[in-house]
Regions:
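Basic, polyanion-binding surface patches
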Residues: 1-209
């Protein structure tokens, strides 16, 4: 079955995140995005792909700051509220009944109750013929909800249930990861069986890993 361009998105499960920003007048905005991806390892940069006419993009251009929050699958209803095309003067936290999670470095808050929060500053914008924008953000702080960290220091994804979206012909299906029982170390991807980025945990006293 060959798929036309507007049907191809049904083939790839996509992450669901909430991006929160402040307008230059201080109005809080939050919007769902799935077209996001980290830029290689170590995870210092993240890319967001956006339509041109988005309040999120305008706010990032104006303030150079944003927060990416990773919601649980239980937050789909609130997420859908933020997907609507409200006026830029509307506080979307209030519309979706979302509580802010205070940031430590940037001004926009994250979304409370999420799995993780990435505080970001604008590194670069790549504008493609005024059709879409690629936002490159530098992660200046990343915090994970302690509730979802297992004894190995990994994300307990079956407990956290990070929301995943799969597009269909008439709408979106939401699900979350389930472990298959398979685990592979990063070193298995290298011929010398050494992961060049494995440096161990950072200073535990600082709370940074």
């Amino acid at each position: 079955l060959e798929l036309k361009p507007n049907k191809r998105e049904i083939t790839i499960p996509m992450p669901l995140v909430l991006i929160s920003t402040l307008s230059k007048n201080g109005v809080r905005n939050v919007a769902p995005y799935s077209n996001v991806m980290p830029i290689l390892r170590p995870w210092d940069l993240i890319a967001i792909f956006s339509w041109i006419k988005r309040d999120t993009l305008n706010n990032i251009r104006d303030t150079k700051e944003f927060v990416i929050s990773v919601p649980t699958a239980d937050m789909v209803n609130e997420t859908m509220v933020t997907s609507k095309n409200y006026s830029p003067t509307v506080d979307e936290f209030e519309m979706a009944n979302l509580k802010p999670y205070p940031s430590k470095i940037v001004k926009p808050p994250g979304v409370a109750g999420c799995i993780a929060w990435m505080e970001c500053v604008l590194e670069k914008e790549i504008l493609e013929e005024n059709k879409y924008s690629i936002i490159i953000g530098k992660i200046v702080r990343l915090e994970i909800n302690d509730e979802y960290v297992n004894k190995n220091g990994d994300l307990d994804f079956e407990k956290a249930k990070p929301a995943v979206m799969i597009c269909g012909n008439r709408g979106m299906y939401f699900t979350f990861p389930k472990w298959t029982g398979e685990f592979r170390e990063y070193s298995e991807m290298f011929l010398n069986s050494k992961d060049p980025l494995s440096g161990g945990d950072a200073d535990e006293d600082s709370g940074v890993r």
